[in-house]
Amino acid sequence: MIFKVFYQETIDEVPVREKTKTLYIEAESERDVRRKLQDRHINIEYIQPLEGAHLAYEQQNPDFHVLEIEQ
């Protein structure tokens, strides 16, 4: 399944909406997403599963690139 992860680049600062970034990752579950990203030291705000029409919509975005992290 593909997940969209909303995150801040640093853990040390208070989250600011304007600095929120996103990435797409393939994983089995939200827990699996967190496990795969744990070494990146980012502040994960929200993990959203993507499927069906929502996934098709996101795939139209030119910035849509799925991270494939093996762990």
From Swiss-Prot:
InterPro entries in the record: RpoY
E.C. no: 2.7.7.6
Keyword RNA-binding attributed: no
Keywords from the UniProt entry: DNA-directed RNA polymerase, Nucleotidyltransferase, Transcription, Transferase
Function: A non-essential component of RNA polymerase (RNAP).
Family under the similarity heading: Belongs to the RNA polymerase subunit epsilon family.
Protein name listed in UniProt: DNA-directed RNA polymerase subunit epsilon
Gene field: rpoY
